Amino acid sequence: MRSEVVLAEVTREDVARIADWLEDPEVSEMWFGRYTYGEPAHLGYEPRKMIDANEVEWDEVFHDPHHEPHRSILSVRTASGEHIGEAQLAIDEALGDAQLSILIGRKELWHRGYGTATVISCLDHIFRNLGLFRAWVDVPEYNTSARDMFEHLGFIHEGTLRQSRPHDGARHNSVILGMLANEYTRLSDSISQGTHSV
């Protein structure tokens, strides 16, 4: 049975959980790593600061449609409503593409299909709702599980960023993987027909 997720609006409680999850080095390394000064890296906002942000600051991060590139930040929930992670889409309407970033913060749920379900939900949104042409990800080479998942779904290797990620005292490459709208249509059809395992 396929794991199911719901993409939902972010709450302050969700941000607090994200901040707590990122304190775990294993979780933060699979997300964006750590800044050179040691704090967990996070795109779009700093979780600890956002917990107490005023309404204007909150809206600038989570509801500002004029920010370029437009960043859509969503909480990932199980079908029963339990918060388990975060999905971000950096949307460039002029280019017709969106970069995906997915975090399942609950480690005990890793390798149980929630990341895959989140990617599929994001792809549905990118291609069906937004009508974009391309989706892409930037995956550090040491996160082999993520790369395998994206490639299993049909993402294609588009390039390598050399030594772009600091990790364990060294620099590592990251890979750019992409999917085009017509490739997603084939994936979606094969999932609905049961000919593609997820």
Can you annotate each of these PLM segments?
Residues 128-138:
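Conserved GNAT acetyl-CoA-binding A-motif
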Residues 17, 99, 117, 134, ...:
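Amphipathic alpha-helical recognition patches that constitute DNA-binding helices
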Residues 106-108, 112, 141-142:
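Active-site acidic-Proline motif in GNAT/NAT acetyltransferases
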Residues 136-139, 156-172:
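Conserved catalytic-core motifs of GNAT/GCN5-like acyltransferases
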Residues 150, 155, 177:
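Conserved active-site tyrosine of GNAT-family acetyltransferases
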Residues 1-108, 171-172, 179-198:
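GNAT-family acyltransferases
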Residues 119, 143-146, 163-168:
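Short glycine/proline-centered loop/turn elements that form peptide/ligand docking sites
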Residues 111-125, 147-152:
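Conserved acetyl-CoA-binding loop-helix of GNAT-fold acetyltransferases
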